Structure formats: structure tokens, C-alpha cells
């Protein structure tokens, strides 16, 4: 549950850069070149963490390990129930629509063109539909089909009750990405693009392999997985309270939902065996509360994988 929307600043360029980025490469964004200017605006892109911040982060993680979750089984057996509770309480009010989706993943726009023909998008971990609605708003393709899935039954109810939900273009259903069964409503190797937006992190590492196999079976040859999720040492990881850590870099939030903080290297290990890596980027952003003079370091990973 990300309480700091990463689309809070209106920008015309992506804040993502490759993990192997060179300072000589050209890129857009808001760059902090002088430390004394840090409180001049609300956010800065591509801010590298200095030794002091990394030392504090390491200390924070070590302290968290002293107070692990005491009843792990409660969060590992039926994790979807915590998401049911979350969406039952918040419905569609918590998250903002991801208007940045086309900016970060322009490949989606090709599927939405009037003459694109039959195209299909699978949005996994759809939640309240905040990725779906901006896509439908941009769509000009009468032959587009969006399959929206989530393992929370309550989330699917929220999607279907939204006035923007149009059964002509969208089909929402309950499905567990890490389950052993594929979706009955989708043929194997039929999906043009799969969106994994702040979804994969909810899985336990021992579920990753099954999830990857399912993704591979659903995607067309040449199809894309569009991925964005929490990166290692993100602010939300460092702010985790006592008795929240399940295992290395795997936590529960205050509402019982789970989150794993990945690295670009892990993305290569997990996805690289089955897919061609088109992008493996990182979005390190410094969010500033100018009134309170507080600096908050955010880290998101963004990637594109092709079958």
C-alpha cells in the first residue's frame, strides 16, 4: 500500500533510467545539481544515495531483523484475505488512476490504435482498476480486450461496480498469479501485453517460479510484460515498524498485506531465464517536504520483458 503516489509531479518524461545507466547518457527529469537547492522543489529524479544514507538504511534493516513477525503462517496461507479487507474498507478511493501508464509504457498505445486489430491486455493485480481506466480512456481500438484479474474477490467487485467498467472491452475475474491453474477465460499464448504494476511484490519468493511459468504460458511469442514495483531500500521498507519482517526483504504492512523489495539483479535472475530483457530500469526519486524540511528517498523498479 503506497501512501506516496509516484505520479505526484506532472512530468513529460520518464523518471526511469537503466540500471547500467552512464552519466554521459541523455535523460529527462528534474536533476539536483547543487545540494543547497534540495528544498527548491518537491521532487528530484535520479538522486544517487550517498554513503550516509546507505549506512542509515543498513542500520535500519538490521534493527528490523531483531523484531520479525511472530506468526508467519497467518500471512502465508491465505494472503488474499488481507486484500479483501483492504478493498472492503477503501474500495476505489485509496489509489489514484495511473495516468502515467502510457508515458512509461508507450508500447500500450500501439494496441489502442483504431487500426490495431484484435489485441489483448492482461492486467494482473488489477486492484480497484487504476491501471485499466486510463487505458480505456485512451483506447480507439474496437477490437481491444482487457482481462483484469486479482486474487482478491473484493477487488474484482470494486472493478465491476465502477461506472467506467465496460464488458465490451473488459473482463474482470478472480485469479491467483502464483496458482497452479491458468485462467479458463484466456487461451494459452494469446496475450499481447501483460501489466504487472505493484503486483509481483505481493508474492512470496517461493511463488515466483510458478508465477513466471504462468506468465510465459499466457503471453504470445513477441508479447511483452510491463513491470513496475518497489525497489530495495525504498522509503516504505525503511519505515517498516517492529514485527513486520517475514524474511529477508519481505514484509507485511500494517493491514496485513505483503510486500517484497526487489533489486534489478533479482529481476534478471527471475525473469531472464524465460524472457528477453528489453528494459531493466530504476527510478530513484527524492521527495521533499519543503515545509517540514524532510527528505524522503523513493525507489521503484521498472522493466520490460519479451517472450
Curated annotation (Swiss-Prot):
S-adenosyl-L-methionine binds at residues 83, 87, 125, 150, 176-177, 197. It catalyses: cytidine(32) in tRNA(Thr) + S-adenosyl-L-methionine = N(3)-methylcytidine(32) in tRNA(Thr) + S-adenosyl-L-homocysteine + H(+). Disruption phenotype: Cells lacking trm140 show abolished N(3)-methylcytidine modification in tRNA(Thr). Cells lacking trm140 and trm141 show abolished N(3)-methylcytidine modification in tRNAs (tRNA(Ser) and tRNA(Thr)). GO terms for biological process: tRNA C3-cytosine methylation. Its EC number is 2.1.1.-. It holds the Pfam family Methyltransf_12. The keyword Methyltransferase applies. PANTHER family: METHYLTRANSFERASE-RELATED (PTHR22809), TRNA N(3)-METHYLCYTIDINE METHYLTRANSFERASE METTL2 (PTHR22809:SF11). One of its GO terms (molecular function) is tRNA (cytidine-3-)-methyltransferase activity. Belongs to the methyltransferase superfamily. METL family. The gene is trm140. This is tRNA N(3)-methylcytidine methyltransferase trm140. InterPro entries: Methyltransf_12, METTL2/6/8-like, SAM-dependent_MTases_sf. S-adenosyl-L-methionine-dependent methyltransferase that mediates N(3)-methylcytidine modification of residue 32 of the tRNA anticodon loop of tRNA(Thr). Does not catalyze N(3)-methylcytidine modification of tRNA(Ser). Keywords: Methyltransferase, S-adenosyl-L-methionine, Transferase, tRNA processing. Disulfide bonds: none annotated. The keyword Plastid does not apply. It comes from Schizosaccharomyces pombe (strain 972 / ATCC 24843).
Amino acid at each position: 500500500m503506497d501512501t506516496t503516489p509516484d505520479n505526484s509531479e506532472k512530468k513529460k518524461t520518464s523518471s526511469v533510467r537503466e540500471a547500467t545507466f552512464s552519466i554521459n547518457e541523455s535523460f529527462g527529469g528534474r536533476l539536483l545539481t547543487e545540494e543547497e537547492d534540495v528544498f527548491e522543489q518537491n521532487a528530484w529524479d535520479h538522486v544517487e544515495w550517498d554513503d550516509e544514507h546507505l549506512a542509515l538504511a543498513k542500520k535500519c534493516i538490521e534493527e528490523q531483523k531483531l523484531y520479525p513477525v511472530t506468526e508467519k503462517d497467518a500471512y502465508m496461507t491465505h494472503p488474499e484475505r488481507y486484500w479483501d479487507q483492504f478493498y472492503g474498507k477503501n474500495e476505489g478511493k485509496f489509489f489514484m488512476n495511473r495516468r502515467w501508464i502510457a508515458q512509461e509504457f508507450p508500447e500500450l498505445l500501439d494496441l489502442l490504435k483504431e487500426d490495431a486489430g484484435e489485441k489483448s491486455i492482461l492486467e494482473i493485480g488489477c486492484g480497484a482498476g487504476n491501471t485499466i481506466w486510463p487505458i480505456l480512456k485512451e483506447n480507439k481500438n474496437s477490437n481491444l480486450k482487457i482481462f483484469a484479474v486479482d486474487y482478491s474477490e473484493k477487488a474484482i467487485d470494486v472493478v465491476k461496480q465502477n461506472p467506467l467498467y465496460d464488458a465490451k472491452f473488459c473482463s474482470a475475474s478472480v485469479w491467483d498469479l502464483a496458482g497452479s491453474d491458468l485462467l479458463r477465460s484466456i487461451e494459452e499464448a494469446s496475450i499481447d501485453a501483460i501489466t504487472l504494476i505493484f503486483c509481483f511484490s505481493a508474492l512470496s519468493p517461493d511463488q515466483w517460479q510458478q508465477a513466471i511459468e504462468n506468465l510465459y504460458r499466457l503471453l504470445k511469442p513477441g508479447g511483452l510484460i510491463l513491470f513496475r514495483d518497489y525497489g530495495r531500500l525504498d522509503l516504505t521498507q525503511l519505515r517498516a515498524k517492529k514485527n513486520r519482517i517475514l524474511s529477508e526483504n519481505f514484509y507485511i504492512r500494517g493491514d496485513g498485506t505483503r510486500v517484497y523489495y526487489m533489486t534489478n539483479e533479482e529481476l534478471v535472475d527471475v525473469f531472464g531465464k524465460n524472457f528477453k530483457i528489453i528494459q531493466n530500469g530504476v527510478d530513484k526519486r527524492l521527495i521533499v517536504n519543503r515545509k517540514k524540511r524532510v527528505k524522503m528517498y523513493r525507489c521503484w523498479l521498472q522493466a520490460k520483458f519479451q517472450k
